[in-house]
């Protein structure tokens, strides 16, 4: 009986030791995930997925700027700049640029071509697989939008007359709960969906673009069945020539703590009454786990 107890005790200690070892083991990065930074500060990440050859190639360009950094006179600039970019060819022939955007939306899971929030702007392209030519065109277009965009009275008027395809995050910045959540926040009064003030100050819009759209504040992400080395070379060739450097830090979004009292919010967007239990949370989760 005593021997049995000793064996059980020994086994339990071994199990505890094993569990402790497993919990202490550091997560290893995926070797298929490549990343780098160009000489101008432009960051890129590429995840090759040869095990999923039929998946579309997902391309995202994130710019660390949003409506929170706008002054009163600049209200609407952060939303309008992607809108203006989407009306331009980005150095591509007109029909070629049009074909690129027609093919860059996933019919099964469509995303808006651009999203603007309080502290970031995001361009989204979803390309058909095995189309390296389209990927090259997409990178070329993004590089043009990132630092070579034409900002003239004619270009601005053309963009204002066209459809606004830029979405915001949150999707509805006027929604009752979100307006309640913004009370006491630094984000209040900096609506990413704010319309552009008329008449447009072209010089001020151009200065805003060149001040905030700098390569050291951009991150490009490519995921799909691609050749990582070839894509990295293409990124260096396409984005390496972008100029500019951030001289002013961006404003940091913050939310005030939620009060621990119930609240009733009326909205026309919900047809049936609902009861929600909310946990307090920061504006965004931690994005870098390394």
Q: Residue spans of the language-model regions?
A:
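Scaffold signal of the M16-like zinc-metallopeptidase fold and its non-catalytic homologs
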Residues: 138, 145, 166-215, 235
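M16/insulysin-pitrilysin zinc metalloprotease superfamily fold
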Residues: 87-91, 125-159, 287-289
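An aromatic/glycine/proline-enriched structural segment found at the starts
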Residues: 188, 219-284
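Extracytoplasmic
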Residues: 30-33, 39-42, 52-62, 72-77, ...
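Solvent-exposed, polar/charged alpha-helical surfaces in well-ordered, non-transmembrane soluble domains
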Residues: 75, 83, 98-99, 103, ...
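Gram-negative bacterial Sec-dependent N-terminal signal peptides
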Residues: 1-23
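M16/MPP (pitrilysin/insulinase) zinc-metallopeptidase core fold and M16-derived inactive scaffolds
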Residues: 58-126, 172, 187-192
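Acidic/histidine-enriched alpha-helical segments
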Residues: 97-99, 148-168, 227, 246-260
């Amino acid at each position: 009986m005593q021997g049995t107890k000793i064996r059980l005790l020994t086994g339990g200690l071994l199990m505890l030791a094993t569990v402790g070892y497993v919990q202490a083991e550091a997560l290893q990065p995926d070797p298929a995930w490549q990343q780098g930074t160009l000489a101008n500060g432009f960051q890129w990440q590429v995840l090759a997925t040869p095990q999923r050859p039929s998946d579309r190639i997902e391309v995202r360009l994130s710019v660390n700027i949003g409506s929170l950094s706008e002054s009163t006179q600049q209200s609407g600039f952060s939303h309008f700049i992607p809108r203006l970019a989407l009306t331009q060819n980005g150095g591509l022939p007109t029909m070629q640029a049009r074909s690129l955007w027609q093919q860059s939306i996933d019919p099964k899971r469509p995303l808006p071509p651009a999203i603007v929030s309080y502290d970031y702007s995001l361009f989204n392209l979803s390309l058909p697989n095995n189309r390296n030519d389209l990927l090259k065109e997409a990178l070329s277009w993004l590089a043009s939008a990132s630092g070579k965009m034409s900002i003239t009275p004619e270009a601005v008027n053309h963009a204002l007359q066209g459809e606004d395809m830029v979405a915001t995050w949150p999707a509805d910045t006027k929604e009752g709960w979100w307006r309640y959540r913004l009370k006491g926040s630094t984000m209040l009064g900096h609506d990413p969906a704010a319309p552009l003030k008329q008449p447009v100050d072209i010089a001020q819009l151009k200065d805003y673009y060149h001040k905030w759209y700098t390569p050291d504040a951009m991150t490009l992400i490519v995921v799909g069945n691609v050749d990582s080395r070839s894509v990295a070379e293409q990124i260096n060739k396409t984005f390496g020539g972008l100029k500019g450097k951030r001289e002013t830090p961006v404003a940091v979004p913050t939310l005030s703590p939620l009060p621990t009292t119930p609240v009733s919010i009326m909205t026309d967007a919900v047809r049936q009454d609902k009861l929600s239990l909310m946990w307090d949370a920061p504006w965004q989760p931690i994005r870098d786990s390394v």
